[in-house]
Amino acid sequence: MDLSEMRTRLRTDLHDEDAANYRWTDAELDRHIDRTVREFSLALPLEATATLTTAAGSRDLSIASLSDLVAIEAVEYPVGEYPLSFVRYSVWLNTLTMLIESTPSGGEDVSVYYTTLHTLDVSSSTIPPRFEDVIAGAAGGYAAVEWSSFATNRVNVGGQDVWRDYLTWGRERLADFQRDLAKHGRRNAVRVRRLYPPAAAPADQSTVQGP
């Protein structure tokens, strides 16, 4: 399903199919779709692999070329061994540092396993088909909630409470979206793997890092 097909699906769900009297412009719907895809990507990102090349005498690798990066998952070095040889690493801004004893020679391959944002554009989509309904529902929810805010205290053809109906419908769709993310998101998925983690776990509100 490409962007145009998703937009059409959205208009059907929102009962906004009268081209002469659209409630939402294409640009507005595209914005809600883009927001939904980004939020979906943070919970269920697209898995990818890139091959980077070492510089002589340096453990650092630039990851600036990894567009729409969500997270680095693992670093394989040297490549081509069996079992695969994963190394510890640290990341700061656009630099990945392999935490290895000896410095690499120049021109060696390093496989970086990472996750990235999904794409949904005019020609293609990386959203798994089974989640297209999830994207459509949430994007419709955002559109309905936004329109209800705009329509409050305005005269509407559907009646004075039509904004409230859209608000309720939109909130229900967004609640469904959050439940789907919680159910299918990577944090709740059982992933059997043995990869080396980053050098330090990211801090959160439950982590105390003292001297």
Please name every model-derived segment.
Residues M1-T12, A27-L42, Y82-P211:
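Internal mixed-charge
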Residues Y22-D60:
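N-terminal interaction modules that seed assembly of large macromolecular complexes
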Residues R11-N21:
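Structural recognition of short helix-loop-helix hairpins that underlie histone-fold modules
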Residues A50-S67, D121-P129, V157:
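Surface-exposed ligand/attachment interfaces on beta-rich extracellular proteins
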Residues A20, A56-S58, E81, G159:
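Intrinsic-disorder/low-complexity loop/linker signature
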Residues S62-E81:
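Solvent-exposed beta-hairpin/edge-strand motifs
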